[in-house]
Amino acid sequence: TSFLTGENVPFYSQGTYYATGYSTFEPTMGITSTDNIYFTSYGNGPAGSTAIVQCTNMIEMTSLSDFSCQNVYGPFLPVANSNDPYVYVDPWTDRIMKFDMHALGGMTVEWSDDEGDSWVGPSLATGYSVQDHQTIASSPYGGILHETLWVFCINGNYPAPLCSASQDGGLTWGPELPGAPVDCQSGGLSAHIIGAENGNFYRGQIGCDGTGYSMYKTDDGAITWTEHVLPTEVSGTADTWNAEEAQVDTDSESNVYAMWMGNDNMPYFSYSLDDANTWSEAIMVGPSHLEGTGFPVVIAGDPGKVAFGYVGTEGDGVWHGYISVITDAFSPSPLITTVQVNAPDDPLDNASPTCGYERCGGFGDFIDMQIDAYGRPWLSLSHNPSGDTGIMGTLTNGPTLLGNVTSLSPLPIGGTQTLA
């Protein structure tokens, strides 16, 4: 009997990218319900601040001339450029949160509730020194004075990440508390935190005993955290610049999806249907012709529908961008469809043969990924040969990751013609 039944069926799929016209570094991104895409552009805002670039009419466009990108961060007193630029869009309220780390000495948050037309803040997010590798998310856990709870985690002077919560939408922040169980020795570096529909927050990194990867969960608003070990016995774990990271996302029903790089530098995936308490057997999700991958990120839509973003190489010294899609992750034999977002003669990096294993051009430490309201994944990347240009990789054709599995409406091919 064929396993290609139900939602586990093939769709014609093709990848492309669209250049934004702005350089980037560690390109985090978000999408609002008005179909605007936002991403960070290091140093290109007013007075040398981090720009928050808004791309309009890119989602569901029919012609390349439809979309445009511009900076929308322009407060009267802009915050100085961030050492680690970061933007996050609250999926439940559309609040655009700009989260800046300043020379390892502290962090500020600013936000916009009107698509970047006006900005509130900055507010001080921490009173401690030596802060790095910050990450922020929200969930409908419910703040006391705001409809969503906000949590950030950082790498500080502690054996595990330190995390803080805001009950009022980012105006004030509670004390930084350990983001792991007592006596955890995971180190402070971790992947991005995410908030689930059921109010849980998750963050992936090295296990408390210093081995493997684990998922860390809080169900009480970042007061306490529990460790949930991922099934890395077969895959092993990467030994690269970002080896500490296990990426995570949740679907519309709060099922949990984890992604990490194995000791073969290939991407692996597992899911949990019980709040990270147990995990499925891990599977490798990258195409077999790749010899190595890096900068993993995962995003989920409705249950079983998940996309993975990463860069990869065939061993020829150049690196490309990839999106792998699964429309029925719970199938005994899930079909994995992978597209390359750039043409073979248009690599995303051709200067470093080990780009995916190190801090590399505009990729920095990480990339980001989101799903729009139509079920299409968007992957924020850097086009290093053109000067670290921020680009949005996506599917011109392929399956939707929301609702019944059908074909996405086609988008025009982008690529190098959008770099001009």
Please describe what each predicted stretch is.
Residues 418-420:
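A short beta-strand segment in extracellular, disulfide-stabilized domains
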Residues 1-416:
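Extracellular, repeat-based ectodomains that mediate carbohydrate processing or recognition
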